[in-house]
């Protein structure tokens, strides 16, 4: 045992010698002995005894030796250093003689010297080596903890703070965008609202359908051009309501190829819808979110409800859509009728004409009618799908086309692709939409994907697209802008009780939308649409899809759609896409939004 221990000890000594030669060449056993003596006289004596009497204290010797090597390994460096610094002679004598007294003296001196170190280290341990141990551990731990905690704090805080900052930036940017849009559109919007409440009626009522159709056709042609172009994506996003209706005209005229499936859908119901659009879309493009369109929507809705058939549903959804933002809704309504047109070409056009007229005439009254109509419509329209769709389209203009379409019930997604854009979006967004109407589906898909991308984030671009791309028709553009931003609605909402709910929804939707926004293009967009749509619904009138997007969304809906449409599917109107995703997304939300929207819409009507 003793020999084994001695061999181990020698190995340790060699190791430590080699290690500390650089520091200070110690005598052969000075390090080990000094450390052992300084730390534990007993282990030191025991090793001695082990050397002298290996058989007597094997276990204790072993213990002592093990302790000594341990002490050596851990503290031999510090002790050796201290010993040398304090009293090399004493350390040497202690190591050679291994007298209990010298080591204590060296130990005391060490203590004295290391007591300062101890204090510095704040380690309560008596011996320097324990101090060192503790210090090392504690310092490491503290450092680690500090760094980790800092890292954790930073990481945890940074994501949160980043998120918060992002949210703030988003809010700020949105508010800025909305302000910008308001400023950009404000003239157009205030004019739009003027145009729409008065001009809505004047447009829809005052403007002869032919006039509206002519302007629409011109705009449609522009829009169809835009649609064909990439900018049309953005524009179609703004144009979701207008270009789609226009596309309907164009598609009726053979723009189908240019506008795609959406155009096809339009072409299907385009000729009948053209007339309705002449009005409904006119007020759609011009009226976008004005409550007059909403009111018109309600009247159309009541009519559609009276009809009860796909036409009825269409009018319902259309009413909701119109009511919702009436701008997109109506535009999409036309689209939807067109979309529906594919499904309900006959009923949808007739209904639409009627609905358009109905929408157009009951501007303010309809706001309330739409309100009452909106909720019942949501409930009435195919209970779940219609609700989701009705609500959806209520909340989102594009939604309305789907809801409006006889097939809206068929699929909330279909609701999403309520307009041409809607169709495209629905198509991409929801199989049901595709199944509803193959033609429609493809447009839906485009629209949807488009809308989804530009829905909220790109709302500014969409609005700009609307603004710059579609400035040609000033009244319409203004109406469209207003409908997009629904700035009056938005402003009202902020002041109005409905605004409270809408805003809450907005914040709620705001969070999901960023994640879901891309989703609308795919069927998964249903869920995204749900959350997004529900929030949108709350802003219902302002931005069917960006209703709640009150910030810039309300006016930026088209923009955001347009951006999205650019990103996703430049062919479709992002706006209807966005709306669509919204509409499908949340039936309950859409209902809530419908209510909230109704109140907002009536607010808008009253204000207008």
Swiss-Prot record:
Entries under Pfam families matching the protein: SRRM_C (PF15230)
Expression across tissues: Specifically expressed in neuronal cells (at protein level). Expressed in adult nervous system and sensory organ tissues.
Low complexity: bias regions: 188-200, 289-299, 389-420, 428-459, 518-555, 574-608
Biased amino acid composition, Polar residues: 322-339
Subcellular location as annotated: Nucleus
Tree of life domain: Eukaryota
Compositionally biased residues, Basic and acidic residues: 78-100, 201-213, 460-477, 495-504
Coiled coil stretches, renumbered: none
GO MF term list: identical protein binding; mRNA binding
Disruption-associated phenotype: About 85% of the mutant mice die in the first few hours after birth and few surviving animals display balance defects and exhibit persistent tremors. Mice show impaired development of the central and peripheral nervous systems in part by disrupting neurite outgrowth, cortical layering in the forebrain, and axon guidance in the corpus callosum.
Function, as annotated: Splicing factor specifically required for neural cell differentiation. Acts in conjunction with nPTB/PTBP2 by binding directly to its regulated target transcripts and promotes neural-specific exon inclusion in many genes that function in neural cell differentiation. Required to promote the inclusion of neural-specific exon 10 in nPTB/PTBP2, leading to increased expression of neural-specific nPTB/PTBP2. Also promotes the inclusion of exon 16 in DAAM1 in neuron extracts.
Protein name, entry field: Serine/arginine repetitive matrix protein 4
């Amino acid at each position: 045992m003793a020999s084994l221990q001695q061999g181990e000890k020698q190995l340790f000594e060699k190791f430590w010698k080699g290690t500390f030669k650089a520091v200070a060449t110690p005598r052969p056993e000075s390090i080990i002995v000094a450390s052992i003596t300084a730390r534990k006289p007993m282990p030191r004596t025991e090793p001695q005894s082990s050397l002298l009497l290996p058989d007597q204290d094997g276990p204790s010797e072993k213990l002592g030796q093990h302790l000594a090597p341990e002490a050596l390994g851990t503290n031999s460096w510090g002790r050796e250093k201290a010993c040398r610094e304090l009293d090399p002679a004493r350390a040497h004598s202690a190591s050679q003689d291994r007298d209990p007294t010298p080591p204590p003296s060296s130990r005391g001196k060490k203590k004295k010297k290391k007591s300062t170190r101890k204090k510095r280290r704040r380690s309560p341990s008596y011996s320097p080596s324990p101090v060192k141990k503790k210090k090392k551990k504690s310092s490491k731990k503290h450092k680690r903890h500090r760094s980790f905690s800092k890292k954790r704090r930073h990481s945890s805080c940074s994501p949160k703070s980043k998120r918060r900052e992002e949210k703030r930036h988003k809010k700020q940017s949105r508010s800025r965008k909305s302000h910008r849009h308001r400023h950009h559109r404000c003239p157009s919007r205030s004019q739009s609202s003027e145009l729409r409440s008065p001009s809505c009626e004047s447009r829809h009522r005052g403007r002869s359908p032919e006039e509206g159709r002519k302007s629409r056709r011109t705009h449609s042609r522009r829009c169809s051009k835009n649609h064909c172009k990439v900018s049309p994506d953005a524009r179609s996003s703004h144009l979701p309501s207008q270009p789609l209706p226009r596309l309907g005209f164009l598609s009726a005229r053979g723009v189908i190829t240019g506008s795609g499936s959406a155009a096809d859908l339009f072409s299907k119901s385009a000729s009948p819808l053209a007339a309705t659009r002449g009005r409904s879309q006119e007020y759609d493009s011009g009226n976008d979110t004005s409550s007059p369109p909403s009111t018109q929507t309600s009247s159309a809705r009541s009519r559609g409800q009276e009809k009860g058939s796909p036409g009825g549903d269409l009018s319902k959804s259309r009413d909701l859509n119109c009511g919702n933002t009436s701008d997109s809704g109506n535009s999409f309504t036309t689209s939807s009728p067109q979309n529906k047109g594919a499904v309900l070409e006959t009923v949808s056009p007739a209904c639409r004409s009627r609905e358009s007229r109905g929408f157009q005439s009951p501007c303010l009254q309809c706001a309330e009618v739409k309100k009452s109509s909106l909720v019942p419509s949501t409930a009435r329209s195919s209970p779940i799908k219609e609700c989701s769709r009705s609500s959806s389209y209520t909340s989102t203009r594009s939604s309305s086309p789907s809801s409006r379409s006889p097939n809206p019930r068929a699929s909330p997604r279909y609701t999403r692709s309520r307009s041409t854009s809607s169709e495209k979006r629905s198509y991409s967004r929801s199989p049901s939409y595709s199944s509803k109407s193959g033609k429609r589906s493809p447009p839906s898909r485009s629209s949807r994907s488009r809308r989804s991308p530009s829905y909220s984030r790109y709302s500014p671009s969409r609005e700009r697209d609307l603004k710059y791309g579609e400035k040609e028709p000033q009244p319409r553009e203004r109406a469209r802008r207003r409908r997009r931003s629904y700035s009056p609605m938005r402003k009202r909402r902020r002041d109005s009780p409905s605004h409270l709910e809408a805003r809450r929804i907005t914040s709620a939707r705001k969070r999901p939308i960023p994640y879901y926004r891309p989703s609308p293009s795919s069927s998964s967009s249903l869920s995204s649409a749900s959350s997004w749509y529900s929030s949108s619904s709350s802003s219902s009138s302002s931005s069917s899809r960006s209703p709640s997007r009150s910030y810039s969304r309300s006016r930026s809906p088209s923009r955001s759609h347009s951006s999205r449409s650019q990103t996703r599917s430049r062919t479709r109107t992002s706006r209807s896409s966005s709306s669509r995703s919204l509409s499908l997304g949340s039936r309950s939300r859409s209902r809530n939004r419908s209510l909230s929207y109704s109140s907002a819409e009536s607010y808008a009507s009253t204000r207008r």
